[in-house]
């Protein structure tokens, strides 16, 4: 068996509606399903090939995810930076790193760090850290 890739990412969030606004209106993900009356309330969004589900954290659930960072590939990180600043998203300016990518960083309402990266080439994308 081989792993083909990341098919689904689920984040537990403190406020589903606030996070939904951040990911859809500010970052540009498309809402494909929103079930605010489910247990827990959830929403699924799509961005490129990534499917992202946001689940409202309930007190009965274990808290997870702190210290987790996400690297999401974009075609043009500089263009995406301009789009985010036009939407008044707090975003760190593009930075080139020695590991082979140019990236920007944002934090979602639950303090998950999201790195949007444009890789210099396929070998940089495939590099193991």
Question: What are the roles of these predicted feature ranges?
Answer:
Residues 45, 52-54, 106, 116:
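Generic preference for hydrophobic
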């Amino acid at each position: 068996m081989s792993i083909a890739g990341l098919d689904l990412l689920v984040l537990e969030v403190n406020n589903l509606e606030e996070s939904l606004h951040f990911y859809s209106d500010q970052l540009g993900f498309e809402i494909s399903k929103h079930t605010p009356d489910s247990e827990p309330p959830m929403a699924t969004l799509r961005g490129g090939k990534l499917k992202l589900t946001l689940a409202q954290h309930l007190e009965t659930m274990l808290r997870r995810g702190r210290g987790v960072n996400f690297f999401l590939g974009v075609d043009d990180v500089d263009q995406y930076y301009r789009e985010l600043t036009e939407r008044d998203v707090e975003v760190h300016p593009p930075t080139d790193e020695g590991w082979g990518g140019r990236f920007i960083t944002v934090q979602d309402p639950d303090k998950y760090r999201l790195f949007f990266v444009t890789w210099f080439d396929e070998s940089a994308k495939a590099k193991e850290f």
